[in-house]
A protein has these predicted regions:
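Class I S-adenosyl-L-methionine
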Residues: 1-152
Length: 152
């Protein structure tokens, strides 16, 4: 069903498919469906961000055209810290925070990804705070600063 939907909604110029612009894998069965779709479509690059890292155990075979970026900030962050995921993303509030946390975590600054290109490299990276944040929160204020710098 996922494969049918995919083929109905893409054209031949599409080379990359992002799985979930928001949301995550909710079960091993659902993850295996996406892995099967990737195997059926070797001409496409499938990529995703996930905090459901427990689903990507040693018994899961990931095809070469499937790019997982582990997202820091979830229940299974210990798997990232133990080195099971070379490619991971951390959300930061500023360029300075990306530099500081990168040096603290891995002795070099995190590069900030602006276009999802880092999802195809085997290295950790940062994403600037994005999306919707609780009204009046520090994150909301930081997001307003980020947006004003982009527009300014």
């Amino acid at each position: 069903m996922i494969n049918e939907s995919l083929h109905k909604s893409i054209n031949k110029n599409i080379k990359k498919v992002r799985i979930h612009s928001s949301g995550d894998f909710f079960s091993g069965k659902y993850l295996r469906c996406w892995l099967a779709v990737a195997r059926l479509n070797p001409q496409l690059k499938f990529y995703c961000y996930s905090k459901s890292l427990n689903l990507f155990g040693s018994n899961v075979s990931i095809p070469n055209n499937f790019y997982l970026t582990a997202s820091v900030g979830g229940k299974y962050d210990a798997l990232i810290h133990k080195g099971y995921f070379k490619r991971y993303a951390i959300v930061v509030n500023s360029v300075i925070e990306a530099e500081t946390l990168g040096i603290l975590h891995r002795n070099k600054p995190y590069n900030i990804d602006h276009d999802d290109s880092s999802c195809f490299k085997d290295d950790a990276f940062a994403l600037l705070l994005h999306g919707v944040q609780p009204k009046g929160s520090k994150a909301s204020q930081d997001l307003q600063k980020i947006r004003s710098l982009k527009n300014g």
